[in-house]
Design a protein with these regions (language model features):
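Alpha-helical segment proximal to the catalytic Tyr-Lys
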Residues: 129, 173-177, 191, 233
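Conserved glycine-rich cofactor-binding loop
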Residues: 9, 16-17
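Conserved glycine-rich Rossmann-like NAD(P)H-binding loop of the short-chain dehydrogenase/reductase
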Residues: 32-47
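C-terminal helical subdomain
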Residues: 184, 205-245
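Active-site helix of classical SDR
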Residues: 124, 160, 168
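Residue(s) in the substrate-gating loop at a strand-loop-helix junction
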Residues: 144
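Substrate-binding pocket helix/loop in short-chain dehydrogenase/reductase
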Residues: 100-101, 108-113
Length: 245
């Protein structure tokens, strides 16, 4: 275990698998105390707690739906009770529903924006008073390539991610006076979501194979570490793409 985040407390939503899991393990290995949040899969949460313990780290795992303000407030209160502060927030929770623009129902549209965009809003708003009081904080949001270039079958997902990019820039501007940096990562990695998207495009468009190979989530975790540490103290309101080759 190294010490890039020694003494820091990080909250990571969508942390039970994929990118969130890789980031949680990376932060724990760098000395952070990590709160891992997921909407489902208590077994996966228990597993990541065990893995962090093997690293010599400290963690708590919680089930919560970030689209519900009450759930988010409960997470924040639990973290404060446990550790008394929150230094880093990673807004990674997300869902993916696939289908053409014409087929998207109002229910699907609202659910996707609720988890991605409203969830990012809820979590960010909940930690602002804490970070203001600390006069320091790091917030890392998640975009997607589809928000930048367009993609078949994910119009609602892309719209939510585009909103997160705009939200990131506005939050960064508003919170800069309190030494709170807000940045955004657009990751491409080998996760369950990319597998589902690849399969959908193959069936819908006749694409026989992946357009590219994807890196493992662990490969892009250092980008999150950069935005979580003092190395990025002079960087805010930025969006970077990671894992796209």
């Amino acid at each position: 275990m190294s010490s890039e985040l020694s003494g820091k407390v990080a909250v990571i939503t969508g942390g039970s698998r994929g990118i969130g899991r890789a980031v949680a393990l990376k932060f724990a290995d760098e000395g952070a105390r990590v709160a891992v949040v997921a909407a489902h899969d208590r077994d996966a949460l228990r597993q990541i707690e065990e893995e962090i313990a093997v690293l010599g780290g400290d963690s708590i795992a919680m089930l919560a739906d970030v689209s519900r303000r009450g759930d988010v407030e409960g997470v924040v209160q639990s973290v404060l009770t446990q550790w008394g502060r929150i230094d880093v927030l990673v807004n990674n929770a997300g869902i993916l529903r696939l289908g053409s623009l014409e087929s998207i129902s109002e229910e699907r549209w609202e659910e996707t924006l609720a988890v991605h965009l409203k969830g990012t809003f809820h979590c960010t708003q909940a930690v602002i008073p804490i970070m203001k009081q600390q006069r320091k904080g790091k917030i890392i949001n998640i975009a997607a390539p589809s928000a930048l270039r367009g993609s078949f079958g994910v119009a609602d997902y892309a719209a939510a991610k585009g909103g997160i990019i705009a939200f990131t820039k506005n939050a960064a501007s508003e919170l800069s006076a309190y030494n709170i940096q807000v940045n955004c990562i657009s990751p491409v990695a080998d996760t369950r979501m990319t597998e589902e998207l690849t399969k959908f495009r193959r069936e819908a468009l006749g694409i026989a194979r992946r357009e590219r190979e994807f890196v493992a989530p662990e490969v892009i975790a250092p980008a999150f570490l950069f935005f979580a540490t003092a190395d990025s103290d002079l960087v805010s309101g930025q969006m970077i793409e990671v894992g796209r080759v």
